[in-house]
Structures are given as C-alpha cells and as structure tokens.
A protein has these predicted regions:
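Residue at a conserved register position within TPR or TPR-like alpha-solenoid repeats
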Residues: 397, 426-427, 458, 488
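Start-of-helix register in tetratricopeptide repeats
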Residues: 388, 417, 421, 449-452, ...
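A contiguous, surface-exposed recognition patch within enzymatic or periplasmic domains that forms
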Residues: 2-14, 52, 66-73, 77, ...
Length: 550
C-alpha cells in the first residue's frame, strides 16, 4: 500500500539578497511583481523545510512545498539508489527570471522558466483513491501565479508496488486576458564522465555558442565526457516516448516516459566537463555537478505562445528507475487505470501565499491595504481606486499594459518612487526621454537601480557631463560600475572600459550579456582580440529562448 507522511529536514541555506526594494517594471530581465536578487550570502544558516513523503515497497518520493513544490528525492528502494541529483545545500545563483535559481530535484516551471517561486512556498495537498490497479496515493503542488493570475498544479502519485512516479499536470487561465506561457519540468540528475544521455535518434536543435540543427547523437554528445561547454539540446516533435540517463559507472539510470502527442518537449541541459563546470558547482557549494533532463508540452524554450483566456491544458507523464541500459529500448508507456485526470478539480489557488491572501482580503473589503508590492494577477483595480492608492494602482495598471492610464496618477505625486514610475512611463511607453529625465532626476537616486535608469536616459539624450557627475557620486554597485564602463566607451576611452571590467569582481550571471557586450566593443575599438574573458562572470551562450519577461 502506498503511504503518505509529513516531516521536515534541515539544510544549509544561503539566503539571497534582493537587488532593490523598487518595483522592477519595464525591465526585460526582471519579472515584476516578483523580487529580483542581486547576491547570495556566502555563509549559510541552518533552515528547516517542510517535506511531504510518498512511499511504497518499490520507491520513496520526497516533495518540498517550501522550495517551489520540487521533488527533492526519488529513491529506488530495491537498490537504495537516489535517482535524482538531490542537492545537499540550498544556494541560489544568478539565473533568470528572478536571479535566484536553485538546482536539484524535479522543478516545475510555469508560466516561465525557471519558476519565479522556486525558492518560495507553493500550495500543497495529499490524497488517496481506489483504482483497478490498487490504491493510488498522491501529492499535489501548485499555485495561482501572482503576475498573470494563471494557475498550475502538478500531481505526483504512486500505485502500490509500482516504481513508476506518475506526474499529472493541469494548467488554466481563468482570467479575462491571454497571457504568454511555457511549462517545463526540469529534472536534475547526477552527471559524471560515464553518464550517457539516451534520447531519440534524429533531428534536434543544439544551443551552445551558436544555435543550429543537428542529428542526434552528434560528435559523441550523448556522453557527458564528450561535452566541453554548457550546451542545451531540444528534440523535434514526433520523436519517441522515452528519454533519460544511464550511469555506466554506477549501473543505474532514470527513464522519462510520455505520449509525444501530449508532451512533445524534450530537453537536455549540461554544463559539460570543461571550464563551464564551475557554473554547475556554484549552486552546490562545489560539492557536486549535475545535468538536467527536461520535458514539456511545447517543442522548445524559444516558444512562449499566448494561453487563451478561459483555456485549460492537462497532460500526463511518468518517471521510473532503469535497472539496465536495455530498459530504454523496452520501456512502454504505463497503462494505469487512474482516476480520470480531466475530471479532477485539483486547483490550489493562492491560499498558501500570505502575500496574495493579504491583497485578496483587501480586495474583498476584509482587511487593510498591504504594504507589499501589488500582485497584478488579482483583480484589484476597483479596490485600489476606492482606497485612493494612486501609486499602487499605477503599478497595477503598468503590469496590465495600461501605462498611459497610470501616468497622470504618478505625475501628480511628489514622492521619489512615484516620480520614478512617471519617468519610466515617459521613456518606455511614450518614447520621450527628455520628459522622462525630468521625472527620473527626482527619483530615489540613493538606489543603484534608479541611478542606472536615469543614466540610460541621459545616455540617449547625450548628456555626458551629467552622466559623469551622476555615476561618480553613485554607490559602487555592480550595475553602476557597468554604466561607468559604458560611459568610458561613450567618451572614447575604451581602455578605461576594459580596465574597469577587468578589475571588478563579478558574480556568475547566466544569459546576461551586458559586460560581455561592453568588453567586445572596447576590444574592437582598441584592435584587440574581442574574446570574452571568464572573469566577467557571463556565459558565452548564443542568445536563444524566451526566458525574459517581455
């Protein structure tokens, strides 16, 4: 009989540090209304996490609602082997969209990858059901997403005596607007030089320092030891129903199975065995490397279509241990007789979120207006207008693509944060940098983000002297230093750009090309090799994917 239980674990936790307290609207590489992070503390603290445990005679599955609902562990009890990369630390690193990605386990990402709540608590529930195959026990995790109001739920289930982990996903948009979306399940697995990646032979897309089509396997890339740089692969639709990994050194592996008509997306991501391996180690405190095998209902992560208003999507997939290398050729889709997924009402809403609950209580007239950032996924316009909350209403309108309506609300306010919003609207929506600068000069210039925004507008206006004065008096934050490097280029001082970039200690930041672009331009101006050095902390991946907020 499958069992359900609840427990806790204590892990070393490196707390992420917010980039700013300002709402990051009109920033492509940040996801309003979520907090973006600019640093992670080097010294961990012990933190307790709530766990839900699903177990039968064959396997034990552990889920952590406090870390985005991820599967933390999947143990094959017949061999006592951990099938996942189960990270022994929680250490966020700088990866889109909120710059606080944590590695390990099976992560669920909707409506963008990576999930903006991967280090936050999501909703959860448990249950059991009788089936012709025996008792079925499940854990459900999910939430109503604060940006769009769309919802996701993943059900993770076991039948008695079966090692197969059932994963059933439900997505819906019960708002009045269509929203961009993607949904990817990201499974972290251990990787060594003897790890073989087993995917369908045939056409695939490879993403490394270039983006191009290949025929898999190509150049030995089905073995981890042959990949020398961070690389992603996406398989074309119509390929087979299985993929996974086999560890030749330890004699074990993990299979993923799905009907490609429901779940066509297949991805492999690896940092390889080369200089990029340090990126994998950054989120593990240097303890271990990993790769990622991913699945989803879209073909690749360059796709972010609109999820229609009132729409719903449900699909099923499965994970199972591989006892031999031959299991990959023999594996068939399970034919379980589970409770009909289409008939379930699995939604978990936002009851888990004190942030959203506070605003919903305010909306219904049951509580005061919270001091937190307004979540645009909730229908708050009437309540905000009734409360006379002009600045919060302006933020809500901006997030709803109604920035022109927000402008008179904040132009009339004297507060620096309201003036900043007015300036951003004039710049990003009205394309009026002179009017924008007038507002941004009255913004909260103690904050490096506000300094950068004003400097970008001054650059458009070619006000170099004012830029120099602004940046020289600003705190030496990383994003301010980048703007100083940009100013040196504007002043035809490319050697100063290179020196400033080279002499600053930078964090690793994935798919952020600011410093590399500056280095490239300055090097070309001096007739030097424009190759991007690793000390800049930016990867050399070609631009690809829809991981940004626009």
């Amino acid at each position: 009989m499958p069992t359900l239980s609840e427990t806790t674990c204590v892990l070393p936790y490196h707390a992420p540090v917010p980039l700013t307290s300002l709402p990051l609207v009109f920033h492509r590489d940040h996801l309003f209304p979520y907090t973006s992070y600019g640093d992670t503390l080097g010294t961990p603290v012990s933190r307790e996490f709530r766990l839900l445990v699903l177990e039968n005679d064959a396997v034990k599955v552990t889920v952590c609602p406090d870390l985005g609902g991820r599967v933390m562990s999947y143990i094959d009890k017949t061999t006592a082997k951990e099938l996942l990369f189960s990270n022994p630390v929680v250490k966020p690193v700088r990866i889109l969209p909120v710059w606080a990605f944590i590695s390990g386990g099976i992560e669920f990402n909707f409506p963008i990858a990576h999930s903006p709540t991967s280090i936050d608590t999501v909703g959860s529930s448990t249950g059991k059901a009788a089936t012709p195959d025996g008792e079925y026990a499940y854990i459900r995790v999910g939430e109503r997403e604060a940006r769009s109001g769309m919802e996701w739920v993943v059900e993770l289930g076991l039948l008695e005596n079966s090692p197969v982990l059932v994963q059933r996903t439900a997505l819906r948009n019960d708002t009045a607007r269509a929203h961009p979306w993607m949904m990817w399940t990201n499974c972290a697995v251990p990787s060594t030089p003897e790890t073989e990646f087993i995917y369908p032979a045939g056409p695939a897309l490879r993403h490394d320092r270039a983006v191009g089509d290949i025929t898999w396997p190509c150049d030995g890339s089905d073995w981890e030891k042959n990949i020398t740089q961070m690389t992603g692969f996406f398989w074309k639709p119509g390929s087979g129903h299985t993929f996974g990994i086999w560890h030749h050194d330890t004699g074990g592996g993990l299979l993923h199975l799905a009907d490609p008509a429901q779940v066509p997306g297949k991805k492999l991501w690896t940092y390889g065995f080369g200089a990029d391996r340090s990126w994998a180690l950054a989120s593990t405190d240097g303890l271990a490397g990993y790769s990622e095998i991913q699945s989803g209902p879209l073909e690749d992560q360059g796709q972010k279509p609109l999820f229609p208003a009132g729409g719903e999507l449900r699909f099923e997939e499965y994970w199972m241990p591989a006892a031999t290398r031959g299991d990959f050729a023999r594996a068939e889709l399970p034919a379980f007789h589970l409770p009909g997924w289409q008939a379930q009402t699995p939604w978990l809403g936002h009851a888990h979120s004190s942030w959203q609950c506070g605003w919903e209580s305010f909306r219904c007239g049951h509580g005061p207006m919270p001091s937190s950032i307004v979540p645009p996924g909730l229908e708050l316009e009437d309540a905000l207008r009734a409360a006379g909350a002009a600045e919060s209403l302006a933020l809500w309108l901006i997030a709803r693509d109604r920035a022109a309506e927000a402008l008179p609300l904040v132009e009339a306010l004297a507060s620096p944060t309201a003036q900043r919003l007015a300036g951003l609207i004039c710049w990003k929506t009205l394309d009026d940098p002179a009017r924008a600068a007038a507002h941004l000069r009255r913004g909260p210039l103690h904050d490096p983000i506000a300094v950068v925004e004003l400097d970008q507008v001054l650059s458009v206006l070619q006000l170099t002297d004012e830029r120099r004065s602004l940046l020289e008096s600003a705190p030496p934050h990383g994003c301010v230093i980048e703007r100083r490097a940009h100013l040196y280029l504007t002043e035809d001082r490319p050697a100063g750009t290179l020196r400033l970039l080279r002499d600053t200690v930078w964090p690793l930041e994935h798919q952020r090309y600011v410093r590399g672009t500056l280095w490239h331009k300055a090097s070309l101006a001096l007739g030097l090799d424009p190759a991007i050095p690793a000390c800049l902390g930016e990867d050399a991946l070609a631009t690809f994917g829809e991981y940004w907020s626009d």
